[in-house]
Design a protein with these regions (language model features):
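Gly/Ser-rich "nucleophile elbow"/oxyanion-hole loop immediately N-terminal to the catalytic nucleophile
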Residues: 81-115, 221-222
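N-terminal cap/lid segment of alpha/beta-hydrolase-fold proteins
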Residues: 1-38
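Short beta-strand element of the alpha/beta-hydrolase
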Residues: 40-49
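A conserved short beta-strand
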Residues: 127-140
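Short amphipathic alpha-helix adjacent to the substrate-entry channel of hydrolases
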Residues: 55-81
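C-terminal catalytic histidine-bearing segment of alpha/beta-hydrolase fold enzymes
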Residues: 180-225
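Short alpha-helix in the alpha/beta-hydrolase fold that links the catalytic acid
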Residues: 166-176
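Short beta-strand/loop motif that positions the catalytic acidic residue
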Residues: 151-152, 157-159
Length: 225
């Protein structure tokens, strides 16, 4: 792992790099970025649009860490059953009291970009310690909503009318089923508006998305000194 003060957003010294996620006799891979200070930091698990953490997802994890929020992005693989197992192992990893850098045992968040919503929704349903969720560029279909609605926890939906994958109109129709979820909709912004390695990337939309996510998780996740 590297140790650095990154230029740009945030002020925390951070540790970041490849991380091993233990699960019994097996070990899975992922990317972890966290503040370098001695403290139990608020923590999120991040699921991106691909099975492995992309450069954009890694960058977002580092940004969270510079703002005092640890972020773990697991490499979930292509097999659906295995992916859910790895997602569960990631939750157990950060909730382990031996992870002295994380306050996840007292509550943590999940963040999904595009297709990562399925795994995030599963954790919301099955892991009571998930206390907040956010999704970016992903349609809230009936399958996801059924799982998210099992829990009355704070949620944040961010989508763009210029991004078909956001499914804005369909997602807005489920607001009644998710009464504690805030909906933020951009009038424009192409597919991948949040991802700096996407042709549809928008600096303006990314900055606003970043600020909304940091503010949301900063408000709802526990921090312990």
């Amino acid at each position: 792992m590297g140790v650095a003060v990154q230029l740009g957003e945030g002020t925390e010294d951070i540790i970041y790099g490849a991380s091993s996620i233990p699960a019994g006799p097996r070990t899975f891979g992922g990317y972890l970025s966290r503040p370098d200070g001695v403290r139990e930091w608020p923590t999120i698990v991040v699921f991106g649009p691909r099975t492995e953490p992309t450069s954009s997802i890694k960058n977002i994890c580092r940004i969270f860490a510079r703002h005092g929020i640890a972020a773990l992005a697991p490499d979930v693989g292509s097999d659906e059953k295995r992916a859910r197992s790895i997602a569960n192992a990631s939750a157990a990893f950060i909730m382990n009291p031996a992870a002295a850098w994380s306050s996840a045992e007292y509550g943590f968040g999940v963040l999904a970009f595009e297709g990562g919503l399925d795994l995030a929704a599963n954790l919301v349903r099955h892991v009571p310690t998930v206390i907040a969720f956010a999704t970016v560029g992903a349609a809230l279909d009936s399958s996801a909503v059924d799982r998210l609605a099992d829990r009355t926890i704070p949620g944040l939906y961010i989508g763009s009318r210029g991004d078909e994958g956001s499914g804005v109109d369909a997602s807005l129709e489920v607001q009644e089923a998710l009464p504690t979820t805030t909906f933020a909709v951009y009038p424009d912004g192409d597919t991948g508006f949040w991802s700096d390695d996407s042709p549809g990337y928008s600096e303006e939309r990314f900055v606003d998305t970043r600020d909304r996510l940091i503010g949301f998780f900063g408000l709802h996740l526990p921090e312990r000194s």
